[in-house]
């Protein structure tokens, strides 16, 4: 029985950080206590590029294994802002189709890259135009977009994330919180971002990093204020998803993704944080 002081959050994770094969992804996540998976790719193919047959096969595998999908981790908006609006609208429709086939409510997106010599303020209107177009599609498709604060996109610092959310003003656009990404752009996540973004925060991406060199480390071992954030989210009544996105391959020499070993390290590190905060993950 969960103590009265505890709450429960649904644990998920980026399956393709474990292996290209979704069967392996599911097995490892379930062994770590997760009942959800965040789908970015399967069989080495990005989610927006999977064929109808591949999507159907993936849906069948998930159903067979009793695994649900927390979000579609799409690449939408992770392109230069100079591309036409329609470029990402078309890809979002494919992501929305994948969400429907796999039974997911959320689609992770970004707010566009821009050239090194381009002043960030000069692209603001173009970004807002594109984000409004994406939100309109999301409303039409019945999904919710989660903006991730990726390093070097327009919305990589709290004020610009808030500007996007408030300017678009759509129930279909919310915030995915990534503490490591904030650290990598010099932001103190809890002190400088939490209060501003909490009203719109609907999804937690579990990643930590160091201010000194930007390296990603297991949750609670960096400067991302993971414990304070989890404690505050618990106090605020957050009951959403916590999705493991370790990015630990470099630290553990496992190649292009975390792999099962580093993913397990990441999961156990986050379990220590949640246990200290009185949060149970299921």
Q: Positions of the model-derived regions?
A:
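Conserved beta-strand positions in the central sheet of alpha/beta enzyme cores
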Residues: 38, 71-73, 108, 146, ...
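Histidine-acidic metal/acid-base catalytic patches
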Residues: 2-35, 63, 103, 158-177, ...
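Hydrophobic alpha-helical packing residues
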Residues: 58, 95, 134, 266, ...
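Active-site acidic/histidine proton-transfer and metal-coordination neighborhood
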Residues: 20-27, 60-65, 80-175, 183-184, ...
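N-terminal small/glycine-rich loop or linker at the start of catalytic domains
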Residues: 2-12, 68-79, 111-114
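Short, solvent-exposed loop/turn segments at secondary-structure boundaries
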Residues: 48-52, 81-86, 118-123, 186-189, ...
């Amino acid at each position: 029985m969960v103590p009265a002081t505890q709450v429960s959050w649904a644990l998920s994770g980026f399956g393709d950080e474990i292996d290209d094969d979704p069967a392996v992804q599911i097995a490892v996540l379930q062994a770590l206590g997760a009942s959800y998976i965040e789908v970015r790719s399967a069989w080495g193919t990005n989610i927006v590029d999977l064929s109808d047959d591949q999507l159907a096969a993936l849906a069948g595998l998930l159903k067979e294994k009793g695994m649900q999908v927390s979000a579609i981790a799409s690449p939408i908006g992770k392109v230069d802002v100079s591309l036409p609006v329609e470029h990402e609208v078309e890809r979002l429709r494919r992501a929305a189709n994948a969400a429907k086939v796999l039974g997911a409510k959320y689609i992770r997106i970004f707010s566009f890259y821009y050239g090194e010599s381009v002043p960030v303020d000069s692209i603001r209107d173009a970004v807002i135009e594109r984000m409004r177009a994406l939100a309109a599609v999301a409303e039409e498709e019945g999904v919710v977009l989660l903006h991730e604060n990726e390093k070097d996109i327009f919305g990589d610092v709290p004020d610009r994330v808030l500007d996007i959310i408030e300017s678009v003003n759509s129930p279909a656009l919310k915030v995915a919180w990534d503490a490591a990404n904030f650290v990598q752009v010099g932001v103190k996540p809890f002190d400088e971002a939490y209060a501003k973004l909490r009203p719109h925060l609907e999804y937690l991406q579990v990643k930590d990093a160091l201010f000194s060199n930007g390296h990603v480390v297991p949750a609670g071992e960096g400067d991302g204020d993971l414990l304070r954030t989890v404690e505050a989210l618990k106090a605020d009544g957050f009951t959403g998803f916590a999705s493991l996105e370790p990015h630990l391959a470099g630290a553990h020499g496992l190649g292009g993704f975390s792999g099962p070993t580093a993913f397990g390290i990441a999961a156990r590190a986050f379990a220590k944080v949640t246990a200290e905060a009185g949060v149970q993950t299921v």
